[in-house]
Amino acid sequence: MAAKKLLILPGDGIGVEVMAQVRRIIDWMGRKRKIEFEITEGLLGGAAYDVHGTPYPAETLEAALAADAVLLGAVGGPKWDDLPFDKKPERGLLGIRKDMGLFANLRPATVLEALADASTLKAEVVSGLDIMILRELTGGLYFGQPRGIDTLPDGTRKGYNTLVYTTPEIQRIGRVAFDLARKRNKKLCSVDKANVLECTVLWREEMIKLQKEEFPDVELTHMYVDNAAMQLVRNPKQFDVMVTENMFGDILSDCAAMLTGSLGMLPSASLGEADAQGKRKALYEPVHGSAPDIAGKDMANPLATIMSFAMCLRYSFDMAAEADLIETAVKNVLKGGLRTADIMQPGKAKVSTTVMGEAVVRELDKLNA
């Protein structure tokens, strides 16, 4: 079996220390499951700017395109707040997503039994929650042209962005969403604002057409984005798979993230088009940011990044058994009462980033025995 090519981009802030714990899991997979990984490490975001004067060096893109999958820690921080817009760390992340053709962002929002009380909502509202939010990643309001800030003849200024989608862009994200729904519970909710925005009228029309022509076995419903935000808080378990536009998905997935109690628990995957062999370019990253306030203090929760690697095994390497093993190990560690600061509960044991990573490795040993 050929070695799996992984590009690791620790990034900024806590990205470095949480990625160190993922390296433990990767090493364990090599030793105990005999999976060979060929690992390259690169720079992205503020760390790249400090070395190269750009948040997105050419060699990082080259390495990403050569890899089977990319693992990212986090980018950004106040250190780089005053940089020009095109030099900010976040431009590196947007750039690599665009150049890798990563159009489908998968954001699971799952409430583990041990953490049902950690949510800000009542346990009975979120217990057993398992939602997959699919966000279109390379079109919509974040990338549409024209965009900019202009100074008008009278001296006032005008800022503008454009919401644009084409039929092929909608169809490709739709197919990923319907396929995910088909593999889960055959329920898909498409979120738009078709009562106001013509672009999302087209979105809704294309989703309906796709369902009729290619996915008649999947139940398709539609919801306006403002109602979807309300329903995620009111009755989140009504949803299974949700699909939506770039900005809507950015907002709704963060809303859904807090149903689980902590951003430190949530992984994500960004996928590109399937090639002739069915393989996709892919980038995996935790939902949380770089958390500069706790960076370097061994306090960060590494579980979202570890679970992102589990998603990598599942979606890029077709290793569902190994992905399940990691997810079960994480569940068991939490059942055992270990908590990082962000998910700390009364009566539980508060541990560091390093100790949490070590605990997951020990649990993997038990499960693999």
From Swiss-Prot:
Annotated protein name in UniProt: 3-isopropylmalate dehydrogenase
Binding annotation for substrate: R97, R107, R135, D226
UniProt family annotation: Belongs to the isocitrate and isopropylmalate dehydrogenases family. LeuB type 1 subfamily.
GO BP terms: L-leucine biosynthetic process
Subunit note: Homodimer.
NCBIfam families attached to this UniProt entry: leuB
Matches recorded under SUPFAM superfamilies: Isocitrate/Isopropylmalate dehydrogenase-like
Pathway connected to this protein: Amino-acid biosynthesis; L-leucine biosynthesis; L-leucine from 3-methyl-2-oxobutanoate: step 3/4
Keyword Magnesium: yes
Positions with a binding annotation for NAD(+): 77-90, 289-301
Residues binding Mg(2+): D226, D250, D254
Molecular function as annotated in GO: 3-isopropylmalate dehydrogenase activity; magnesium ion binding; NAD binding
Main function: Catalyzes the oxidation of 3-carboxy-2-hydroxy-4-methylpentanoate (3-isopropylmalate) to 3-carboxy-4-methyl-2-oxopentanoate. The product decarboxylates to 4-methyl-2 oxopentanoate.
